Structure formats: structure tokens, C-alpha cells
From Swiss-Prot:
It comes from Pseudomonas fluorescens (strain SBW25). Pfam families: LpxK. GO terms for biological process: lipid A biosynthetic process; lipopolysaccharide core region biosynthetic process. The keyword Lipid biosynthesis applies. Belongs to the LpxK family. InterPro entries: LpxK (IPR003758), P-loop_NTPase (IPR027417). GO terms for molecular function: ATP binding; tetraacyldisaccharide 4'-kinase activity. One of its GO terms (cellular component) is plasma membrane. This is Tetraacyldisaccharide 4'-kinase. NCBIfam families: lpxK. Its EC number is 2.7.1.130. It comes from the Bacteria.
Length: 336
């Protein structure tokens, strides 16, 4: 088990050795709290966008279903006639310059896997830059937009925001509720009291402190041809090689089991690079991966390689709440 996997296991299941990391946790907490205090006091260079900015982020390390929810937000806003843009850090991207506009024809090496997925799925204007403020400025210089979604960036306080949505894995929760490196939290748990909405991925119903949403398998898509098949394409009991290089790969493997397949699990690090050799598994079986992994594998995909497309389904209460926020943030003329 890799060191990162052992640490993740300790955060969520407990380990006495984590006590040794508490002095570093105290230092980390002071740094992040100082950043937030400066932001609240209006100190430093903080960019206020002329159009509303909605941050979709995490307070924990690891995957929470953020990208599918962003895809849902894009399409929901578009159905209301809104022009939406996205900014992202572009983790792992190696563009020739920053900021960099992501196009559907780019490689994942150039664009980053999550930004490329978003552009290929939605065709939305998307700019990557670790400096989210600079990304927003570049996006607005090239596009007329009504709303900007910030992919992650909850802790990027140089960009002012109008709405903060924080996602939490309903099954794993906040682990031991301690900050890095003694726990999985990027900011102290008290930070959740100041965000606009919490969304619990996998919750059966809305909670007193937040909304439920779930990820629903939508289709199997062939990497080579783009052919779409229903999720019952494989017979119950079918063995498949399951590949996931995401923040919480076990959630993906569990999803395949709910479809009554028998996945042979191959977990990789989040944003891991792939090659044909790395994915040359035995025995020879169909291979199913996440859509995020697929954008890195199309160039060398084999005929029986598929990705599972998933759609975010937020609760009706969240949809109504979000529409109310849009009415508050946007001029009435922009909304139907």
C-alpha cells in the first residue's frame, strides 16, 4: 500500500501515529486561518469579478463528486439561457502559457484531465490557471458571460466569490475531523459554518445541514468509437477490469458492483498518467474506467475499453434553493 493510501486509511479509520503530526497540523491551521482572516478583512489583492462567481469545492482531500456536479450546474444554467464559463487550477496540466484556454482537441497533458472532461462533455469556455483571478480575467476578456463556476478554489481567497458550494462524501464524512497532515481537512471544520450550501454525495435524503445528491450511471461509452450503450450492456456477473485514478476509487468500484458486475479493481493515484503497458491486464476482459481517466487513454484505447458516464442528481430542494440564489445574483432580464 502506497504511503498516500496508508495516510488516507489512517485519517478515516484512525491510527495512533497520527498524534505525531499534530504539531504540523497546528502550524497548518494557523497559516490557513491567517489567509481567511485577511480575506474577510479585505486585505491583500482580492479580485471581484463583474459577473457572479460560484465556487464548487471541497474541505477534504480526495474525491467528492465535484466534476459531475459542475457538469450538472453548467447544463442547468444553460437551460435558463445563461452563458456560463469555468475556471480551474488545471492540476497536472502543462500548457505553454498561463492562463490557458482548454479546447476539446487538447490532450490531457496539456489541459489537465478534469478541465478536458468538462470541455469535451459540455463545450463550455474554460480557462486554467493556478491563479483563479487571472483565469477569470482572461475568460471575461474573450467571452461574454453571465456566470462563472470555479472548479475547486474554495481556499483560493484572491478570488472573491458570490456563492460557495461544498461537497462532502456522505459515506466517509470528514474522517477524524482534523486538518492536514493529521487529518483530511484543508480548513478547520468550523469553515463549513460560513459556506452557502453543503451537498452530501450519496446521502439518501436531505439533511438538516445540507442537501443530498447522488451519481447515477448513465451509459457505457466506448473509448475507441464513442459508441454509447446502456449500463446493462454487460450481463450480470460479467467480470471486468475496473480502472480508477480518482480521489476515492472505491466509490467507483462499488458502483460497478451495484450494476451486478464483478470488477477486478485497479486503483491508481488521483490524476495518474496511463499507458497501454500499464493497463495491459490479464486475463483478457472488458475494461471499464471513469470518464476522468478516459480522457487520458483514448490515444491507445483497445476495442473493449469503456468508460462509465455518470450524471449528478441533486435533490429537488437543492435545485429550488439554487434557482433562488440565481434570481438573487443575476439581473431579472437574464432569467426566464
Amino acid at each position: 500500500m502506497a504511503m498516500s493510501d496508508r495516510l488516507l486509511k489512517a485519517w478515516y479509520e484512525g491510527h495512533p501515529a497520527l498524534a505525531l503530526l499534530r504539531p504540523l497540523e497546528s502550524l497548518y491551521r494557523r497559516v490557513v486561518q491567517r489567509k481567511r482572516t485577511r480575506f474577510l478583512a479585505g486585505e491583500g489583492e482580492i479580485y471581484q469579478s463583474p459577473v457572479p462567481v460560484v465556487v464548487v469545492g471541497n474541505i477534504t482531500v480526495g474525491g467528492t463528486g465535484k466534476t459531475p456536479l459542475i457538469l450538472w450546474l453548467i447544463e442547468h444554467c444553460r437551460r435558463s439561457g445563461l452563458r456560463v464559463g469555468v475556471v480551474s487550477r488545471g492540476y497536472g496540466a502543462k500548457p505553454p502559457q498561463l492562463p490557458w484556454r482548454v479546447e476539446a482537441s487538447h490532450s490531457a497533458d496539456l489541459a489537465g484531465d478534469e478541465p478536458l472532461l468538462i470541455v469535451q462533455r459540455c463545450g463550455v469556455p474554460l480557462m486554467i490557471d493556478p491563479d483563479r483571478s487571472r483565469a477569470v480575467k482572461a475568460l471575461l476578456a474573450s467571452e461574454t458571460l453571465d456566470l462563472i463556476l470555479s472548479d475547486d478554489g474554495l481556499q483560493h481567497y484572491r478570488l472573491a466569490r458570490d456563492l460557495e458550494l461544498v461537497l462532502i462524501d456522505a459515506a466517509r464524512g470528514l474522517g477524524n475531523r482534523r486538518c492536514l497532515p493529521a487529518g483530511p481537512l484543508r480548513e478547520p471544520v468550523e469553515r463549513l459554518q460560513s459556506v452557502d450550501a453543503l451537498l452530501y454525495n450519496g446521502a439518501a435524503s436531505d439533511r438538516e445541514d445540507g442537501f443530498a445528491f447522488r451519481l447515477q450511471p448513465a451509459a457505457l461509452v466506448n473509448l475507441q468509437t464513442g459508441e454509447r450503450q446502456p449500463v446493462d450492456h454487460f450481463a450480470p456477473g460479467q467480470q471486468v477490469h475496473a480502472v480508477a485514478g480518482i480521489g476515492n476509487p472505491q466509490r467507483f468500484f462499488n458502483t460497478l458492483e451495484t450494476l451486478h458486475w464483478q470488477p477486478i479493481s485497479h486503483a491508481f493515484a488521483d490524476h495518474a498518467p496511463y499507458s497501454a503497458e500499464v493497463l495491459n491486464f490479464t486475463p483478457s476482459l472488458p475494461l471499464v474506467m471513469t470518464e476522468k481517466d478516459a480522457v487520458k487513454c483514448r490515444a491507445f484505447a483497445q476495442p473493449d475499453w469503456w468508460y462509465l458516464a455518470v450524471d449528478a442528481l441533486p435533490s429537488p430542494a437543492f435545485v429550488a434553493w439554487f434557482d433562488t440564489q440565481l434570481m438573487r445574483l443575476l439581473p431579472a432580464r437574464l432569467l426566464p
